[in-house]
Amino acid sequence: MELPLPEDVASVLYLTPLAAVREVNLWNGAPPPYSMLQLWARVDHAWAKDRVGRSYPTRKSYFKSTRLLPRTLYRQYQSYRDCQCLQETSPFTREVHHTCVQLDPLSPSTDGEHSPSSGSPAVLRQHREIWF
């Protein structure tokens, strides 16, 4: 597969306190001359080599971070849906993902008693809240 030289590749470097991110457009906004199947089939997904042997980011790794990114934070909190949720927040998105475990209504057990242990199993429910 014939790839362009690095000087023919448009890229923008974003520097933040958390990461240095290079955004790469391999074909300068033009439609890629290769199918996505060809692009994603490469063994080395992070970098490719040009005709001269120099390495540069590929379409597969559109963003390449050079610094360690912070961990995603987890904490419990009361959701607006009235359930105790495990909240997953990432510093790079406004979306907050919640995973809630709730029991279904009690169902009769084999001996006629009503108990959560003999009724329906816990149902894992997931919903998404977006904070602005």
From Swiss-Prot:
May play a role in infectivity. This is Protein p15. The lineage of its organism: Viruses, Riboviria, Orthornavirae, Kitrinoviricota, Tolucaviricetes.
